[in-house]
Amino acid sequence: MLTVCWFLYLVRTADNALYTGITTDVGRRFLEHQTGKGAKALRGKGELSLAFSAPVGERSLALKMEYRIKQLTKRQKERLVAGDGSFEALYESLQTPPVKRD
């Protein structure tokens, strides 16, 4: 069975807001956003740029990461985009199985 790799990405709008999403094809999805066929949240937001993308593996992990990143503050998202290691730390924290407590 063929395993599809999912990616997490952040798009920057003209007013410097960051939109977070997941996809199996970053180039295709970004083009959809640029042509108004993507998320409604990005329609009419002016020029868009791809600020960040990274492979995360399975869809379930991509969904968890998307949720966690959407909970971050703008400052925390900017640090993630800048490559401060927070993406890797988040990725690792979601990869580690929860500790079983007695």
Curated annotation (Swiss-Prot):
HAMAP family noted in UniProt:
UPF0213
Task: Tell me what this protein is called.
Answer: UPF0213 protein Ent638_3592
InterPro entries, from UniProt?
GIY-YIG_endonuc (IPR000305), GIY-YIG_endonuc_sf (IPR035901), UPF0213_domain (IPR050190), UPF0213_GIY-YIG_endonuc (IPR022992)
> PROSITE patterns this protein is in?
GIY_YIG (PS50164)
Pfam families, sorted: GIY-YIG (PF01541)
Name the protein family: Belongs to the UPF0213 family.
Q: Which residues form the GIY-YIG domain?
A: 4-79
